[in-house]
Swiss-Prot record:
Interacts with GPHN. This is Inhibitory synaptic factor 2A. It is found in: Postsynaptic density. Keywords: Coiled coil, Phosphoprotein, Synapse. The lineage of its organism: Eukaryota, Metazoa, Chordata, Craniata, Vertebrata. Its main location: other. GO terms for cellular component: postsynaptic density.
Amino acid sequence: MVSKDTGKCILTTSESEVEPAACLALEMKYALDPNRQIKKRNKALQVRFKDICEAQNEQRDTQLSSGQLGEKREAKPVSCRAAYRKYMTVPARRSIPNVTKSTGVQTSPDLKKCYQTFPLDRKKGNLKSLPAADPFKSQNNGFLTDAKEKNEAGPMEEARPCGAGRVHKTTALVFHSNQHMNTVDQPLGVNCTEPCKSPEPLSYGEAALQNSTRPPSEEPDYQLLGRAKQDRGRPNSEEPAPPALRRVFKTEVATVYAPALSARAPEPGLSDSAAASQWSLCPADDERRRATHLNGLQAPSETALACSPPMQCLSPECSEQPSQTHTPPGLGNQPSPTAVAAGEECQRIVPHTEVVDLKAQLQMMENLISSSQETIKVLLGVIQELEKGEAHREGLSYRTGQDTANCDTCRNSACIIYSVELDFKQQEDKLQPVLRKLHPIEETQVIPSPYSQETYSSTPKQKSKTESKKHGRWKLWFL
């Protein structure tokens, strides 16, 4: 019996009639609705899912379609009973797990909303409280945020010296490398005497004098730069002007250190050399001195009237040299003896620092080699232990003196050692030319490497299996 109430139909017939009609309608609706279509799944399992979904949909539909409370009350038990009976009548084979208890992947869209106790939600209940983790985002999670805050809120005064230091370091590096190249590559004559013989430095010296009468604090940044440029522009220096990059560095350093300069400016009457003899009271002085001497170690002649600072050399022995002494102006264009001596000493000493560096490098490489050899031994030991364990599990006896030619592990580990050895050989190859430069006398006594030239190629040829078997034996000599 179907009663119509404002176009909405409510099922009030007996249970036997309800079931087939409702199910049919539901199934039609289910098939047509794209949202409810279940993705590919085990057929039997799909039936179970379908039943559950249908039961719930039926319940919802009846509730929606019923207007009054009384009708709702009437319809609810009907649909529940129908759904329950249908769910029970589907044959459950042993292979089908009970869906409500299973931990299967959740694929159908509706179950999650309706079954609040669906296993995924019930077991991992803590997932629901995930938003609680959000507040921690704003909290301080270690030193990264600290650093950020410091950068944002910290005073600019703190930031500037840091940046200045960095720039200073870079500049120093650039200058050092430049000096290094010049001292090694240029003959002494080019460095010292030739530039000094030209009459042109007279004007340069005067300009420098005018500059030096002012205290460095008054000396503008561009003038520092200009001076370096003057020096660079001298035709006799026989060197291409260095790239503009260095110039940028210099201005940066000059500007950053301007406050420091004004703080410690010497008296106006003093010439630059007086400030210079106090070996870098402030880094900007250092910078200016380097700027004047950018083009190699040119020995300052008396024409510069001691305006240019003493020579800078990489090695500590050289930096201990006393500042250049004043000679009477009568000496004219001859280079001062101290300058020449210092230049010679520089040339003598620079290779010494190279040797020290190389020795340190060699020491490091030796340490690396020995440590990696130890690592290899340990690894081989581990491999053997594993093999032994496996052998014992299978009831076999395991001796380390086994047939290495046929032992897979031994062959592979030999390959490991081979690759490491190849690496060492290549490194050695790179080092040999340097060693020859250092000891040209011993060149004849260089021991020829026992390895063939092929071994050095960066991509070793793939060895055949028999070959690697052969090598396997003697590669493991140290075990």
